[in-house]
Amino acid sequence: MIRGGGSPSPYPSVPNPSAGLKRQCAVGAPRKSVMSQTGRDDPQSLDSQLCFAVYAAAHAFGRAYRSLLAHHELTYPQYLVLLVLWEEEGLSVKEIGSRLFLDSGTLTPLLKRLEASGHVRRARDRPDERQVSIFLTDKGRGLKGKMDCLPHTVGGMTGMTLDERRALLDNLASMRDELHARAGSTELPAANASR
């Protein structure tokens, strides 16, 4: 179900996602499709893929932020780390990774670059010396005020109103949570594994 007053999903809610996918993807099974409502009748076309639309939009956001962040010599992933730390300092690498959906192999180099540029510092936790906590430096804290306009600026580039952006954010968060909850238990039939 789409939040924010949108239309209900044309796909049935199925307690066992695997059974639902097999039933929906069965040869000759009629199914109501979002694609046919928008003129995209081929469910295997790239333009009909919700996953690709989200992927492409994420890349477009990255490009939009890249030019704005270049003035501060930051990358978009580094900016995301700073957003987390502006909310709460002293988090472990694992806690930051959990919030950003990044593994330590991806996050550790980002933190090293932020540390080398003077935006963050690492500190060993006194009770457990193996645990490293990440804190902002004065330079890192000072960037927050300089970047307050970024979300509004990039949001304005979308061509959507603030209310539309908030509704989309709610829908995407709901979709993300559902996918995380179901991803491990879904078994796709080999012939229809495109989504």
From Swiss-Prot:
GO terms for cellular component: cytoplasm. Residues 47-177 form the HTH marR-type domain. Disulfide bonds: none annotated. It is found in: Cytoplasm. PROSITE patterns: HTH_MARR_2. InterPro entries: HTH_MarR-typ (IPR000835), MarR/SlyA-like (IPR039422), Transc_reg_Sar_Rot_HTH (IPR055166), WH-like_DNA-bd_sf (IPR036388), WH_DNA-bd_sf (IPR036390). GO terms for biological process: response to stress. The keyword Transcription regulation applies. It comes from the Bacteria. Disruption phenotype: Disruption of the gene confers the ability to use formaldehyde as a sole source of carbon and energy. It also confers formaldehyde resistance during the consumption of alternative carbon sources. Mutants are defective in the transition to methylotrophy. Keywords: Cytoplasm, DNA-binding, Stress response, Transcription, Transcription regulation. GO terms for molecular function: DNA binding; DNA-binding transcription factor activity. Residues 93-116 bind DNA. Formaldehyde-responsive transcription factor that modulates resistance to stress induced by formaldehyde. Impacts the expression of a number of genes encoding transcription factors and/or involved in stress response, including efgA, and which probably collectively trigger a formaldehyde-specific physiological response. Required for optimal transition to methylotrophy. Not involved in a general stress response. Can modulate formaldehyde resistance independently of the formaldehyde-sensing protein EfgA. This is HTH-type transcriptional regulator TtmR.
